[in-house]
Amino acid sequence: MEGGGVADVAVPGTRKRDRPYKGIRMRKWGKWVAEIREPNKRSRLWLGSYSTPEAAARAYDTAVFYLRGPTARLNFPELLPGEKFSDEDMSAATIRKKATEVGAQVDALGTAVQNNRHRVFGQNRDSDVDNKNFHRNYQNGEREEEEEDEDDKRLRSGGRLLDRVDLNKLPDPESSDEEWESKH
């Protein structure tokens, strides 16, 4: 052993760290994109641009599953059990459509969860216990309606949630500046 018996060790800053999942890459401006090479061809299937690496990886997984079958190496093998694989060849356009649908759903879900976390965690810091319970409920895939209703009532009634405006957060597209000015 010429190398002194040292196994291959991942060095920080290597490509593995830049690409957390197979089949995706990050653009300079922070978006994650997914693409896959068609079998026996030089062409690539463009699977879309996403805001999270998980969404891009799920789009890639869907495409590789339909292109290469159930034996394909997936990023999230546990998340594709409901899919039925058929031996019939699917067109590239059909595979792209299925993959982009999955990626868009994951991206939208991630964005919705992120927005709710910003709304609750960024503005309501009065109760750490409530925040921990809210986070735990999100991890379990559920959110109690009474918490949501209570937050909405406080927002509408001019409660403490609006007293602490986070200037680093983008405004909700549903509310306008005119609504804010008319209330104050």
From Swiss-Prot:
The keyword DNA-binding applies. GO terms for biological process: ethylene-activated signaling pathway. PROSITE patterns: AP2_ERF (PS51032). Residues 20-77 bind DNA. Residues 161-172 have a biased composition (Basic and acidic residues). GO terms for molecular function: DNA-binding transcription factor activity; transcription cis-regulatory region binding. It is found in: Nucleus. Residues 174-184 have a biased composition (Acidic residues). Belongs to the AP2/ERF transcription factor family. ERF subfamily. This is Ethylene-responsive transcription factor ERF010. It comes from Arabidopsis thaliana (Mouse-ear cress).
